[in-house]
Amino acid sequence: MSMLCYTLIIAFLIGIWAAPKSEDNVPLGSPATSDLSDTSCAKTHEALKTSRNIDQHYPAPKKAEDQEFGSAANIIVDPKLFQKRRFQSPRVLFSTQPPPLSRDEQSVDNANSLNRNIRAKREDHPVHKRGEYSVCDSVNVWVANKTTATDIRGNLVTVMVDVNINNNVYKQYFFETKCRNPNPVPTGCRGIDARHWNSYCTTTNTFVKALTMEGNQASWRFIRIDSACVCVISRKNENFG
């Protein structure tokens, strides 16, 4: 009888040890996944640093309950989405304020700019040496509140403006490069022989990974943003004979 009782107790303990925990079966992106370990949270905050060097004087991230009811910030994003390096892009950053364009510039702190594109400090195209100029003049800007974009398949998708991570709200910023003027000189691009060539400056695009909305879930997609300013030239028709 004692051997039978011993066997039943062992079987009962094995059953308890093998029973799956309920939190292991929670689908990715659900609110329950916000209860992560301290190690996972630390990795998430590292991924959210602007240029991996956030100014310590930035204000604390806004709480989700401070946002308007029904906003996209109420959709919780799983921090695990930020742990894979292939999803990280130097042109897409998550921060409470627009990052500086370079280490030498100060960040922009303008509370009135939240409802439009946030433009950081701009300056004329630098001249490194006397007599050296750029064919086209470009400007770098941090773009916020981007609500829609074209994905790599040509479809119009919804871009997440605010990201709710562990009940903290971060804004998604895009570093874009645009042409300042399609004709920096009256004849088109600077330095082009206008006697034989037509020229103009135009903005080109690239695709970056960004957080977008798919139903009520957040997902990574390649979207198109402005990335460079180039000169386009074409030969003028010449009459021979």
From Swiss-Prot:
Propeptide: 19-122
Signal peptide segment: 1-18
Disulfide bonds: C136-C201, C179-C229, C189-C231
PROSITE patterns: NGF_1, NGF_2
Residues carrying sugar: N145
Key word Chaperone present: no
Record-level GO cellular component terms: axon; dendrite; extracellular space; synaptic vesicle
Transmembrane segments: none
BP-aspect Gene Ontology terms: cell surface receptor protein tyrosine kinase signaling pathway; modulation of chemical synaptic transmission; negative regulation of neuron apoptotic process; nerve development; nerve growth factor signaling pathway; neuron projection morphogenesis
Keywords recorded for this protein, A-Z: Cleavage on pair of basic residues, Disulfide bond, Glycoprotein, Growth factor, Lipid-binding, Metalloenzyme inhibitor, Metalloprotease inhibitor, Protease inhibitor, Secreted, Signal, Toxin
Entry's localization field: Secreted
GO molecular function term, any single one: lipid binding
Family: Belongs to the NGF-beta family.
Subunit (UniProt): Homodimer; non-covalently linked.
UniProt function note: Nerve growth factor is important for the development and maintenance of the sympathetic and sensory nervous systems. It stimulates division and differentiation of sympathetic and embryonic sensory neurons as well as basal forebrain cholinergic neurons in the brain. Its relevance in the snake venom is not clear. However, it has been shown to inhibit metalloproteinase-dependent proteolysis of platelet glycoprotein Ib alpha, suggesting a metalloproteinase inhibition to prevent metalloprotease autodigestion and/or protection against prey proteases.
Protein name in UniProt: Venom nerve growth factor
Originating species: Crotalus durissus terrificus (South American rattlesnake)
